[in-house]
Amino acid sequence: MNKWLNQFFKEIEKEKYDNTVMPKMWDILNEISEKTGFDEHRILMLSLYGSQNYRMNNENSDIDTECFIFPSHDDIIYARSLFSKCIETQYGTCHVKDIRAAFNELRKSSPNILEILASPYMIINREYYFLMKQMCCDYINYIATLNLYKLMRGLDGLYNKYRSEMNASNKAYANMLRIENMMTSVLLKEDYTKELIPHNYISLKAIKYSDKIDTELREKTENGYSAVLRANVNKFYDRLETDSDEKVLGTINFWQSELMDKYIRLEL
């Protein structure tokens, strides 16, 4: 490991089930720094994105990541477009983006950004570790469920995407069932983030990597549980207030202000 990495960055303190992931994450962080020229003054964190997060990977799965960076002084002064670039690493794809983009996604209650921030596989800049640990560990379920309407809409969109592909792809079908778990946890008012790793991940993984497509099972899903879920989701929308944006914006703006204020004090 590059010495500067260990000096300036730290793994998040969360339980991890796969000890092979984090050494590769450190390699990715070093590779991203070399390819972008960003160092500890610009890089906030690196987090895992994809199948390892929900235990549906195998030995051939890519390790895809997201790396959040701070804007430069000129980026802020001249209101430049938010930095965003996909970089191929030795293990997969890393999407490097301005941390302000992550907060924009949080304001929409995007399931994708929530997965990234809730990941147990994360490396954080030591200067911001306590603040990010609070956000990504202590308050992540609170943040995720601030606007249940938007959260469910986001999950609903993912669910329908995978549902439309399920007859042609075992991966899509397994992911559709994974999203069902998450939608059900919202409907039952349970801890949403616990289903980021599905309780039935073993059976979902078996479906994902099966050599054949079980059309009969898909028909049962389409006519059975999917129909019941759809009815309950529609009732959920009818009952739910949709005017909670002010509460969401206040909370997300607070976290963004805390982070950016500290960055400006330290670096600018």
Mark where each language-model region is.
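A basic- and aromatic-enriched beta-loop-alpha substructure that forms the phosphate/nucleotide-
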Residues: I76-L158
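Conserved nucleotidyltransferase catalytic core and NTase-mimicking acidic/glycine-rich helix/loop elements
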Residues: I124-D261
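A structural signal for short, well-ordered beta-strand segments and their strand-loop junctions
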Residues: M45-L48, E115-I116, S185-L188
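Generic structural signal for hydrophobic core residues of well-folded globular domains
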Residues: I69, L106, E180-L187, Y263, ...
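Aromatic-acidic/polar surface patches that form glycan- and anion
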Residues: Y17-M22, H95, E165-A172
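Ligand-binding pocket scaffold of soluble enzyme catalytic domains
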Residues: T20, K24, E34-G37, R42-L44, ...
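Active-site nucleotide-donor binding segment shared across nucleotidyl transfer reactions
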Residues: N30-R80
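Helical scaffold of the NTase/Pol beta-like nucleotidyltransferase catalytic core
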Residues: M1-S47
